[in-house]
């Protein structure tokens, strides 16, 4: 399957997450697009045994983003270098589970605690195993501390200012 899977329910483009209501991120998702049941266990459809890596781009008034990916394997890449010499090398294949856009509610800002709860839900209810969760520098100290306190590996990574991550 090409492209990043879209797990949003029909008609949803952005996920409004605030303290205005009791809705959580998972309430806006079609679970069958990224989860499956094996025996009595819920797990990711794609490569359930692989660790996931996530980045959170935080905001409270504008748009926040959550992306989750995993290493799907490696692939042989063959070609020619500038002078016509052939080359072949294996490169890692990264597969995105999803990329979500989160917006504020009508009257209240984005609830960062509900973003944290989403990671707890993915791990505790859906069988996701996380290798690392990163967040940009803006307002990330408290959410990352909370995730770390709940046994997630976390770090800060500002991709807006450091183009080397691209």
Tell what function each PLM region has.
Residues 1-159:
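RNase H-like, metal-dependent nuclease domains and their acidic two-metal-ion catalytic environment used
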Residues 158-166:
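Core RecA-like ATPase module of SF1/SF2 helicases and allied nucleic-acid translocases
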């Amino acid at each position: 399957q090409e492209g990043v899977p879209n797990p949003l329910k029909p008609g949803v483009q952005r996920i409004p997450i605030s303290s205005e209501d009791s809705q959580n991120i998972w309430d806006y998702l079609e679970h069958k697009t990224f989860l499956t049941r094996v025996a009595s266990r819920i797990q990711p459809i794609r490569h359930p045994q692989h660790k996931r890596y996530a980045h959170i781009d935080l905001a409270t008034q504008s748009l926040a983003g959550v992306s989750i990916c995993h290493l799907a394997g490696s692939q042989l890449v063959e070609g020619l270098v500038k002078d016509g010499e052939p080359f072949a090398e294996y490169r890692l294949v990264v597969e995105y589970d999803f990329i979500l856009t989160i917006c504020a509610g009508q009257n209240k800002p984005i609830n960062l605690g509900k973003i944290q709860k989403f990671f707890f839900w993915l791990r505790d209810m859906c069988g996701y195993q996380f290798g690392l969760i990163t967040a940009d520098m803006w307002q990330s100290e408290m959410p990352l501390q909370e995730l770390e306190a709940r046994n997630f590996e976390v770090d800060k990574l500002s991709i807006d200012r450091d183009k080397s991550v691209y």
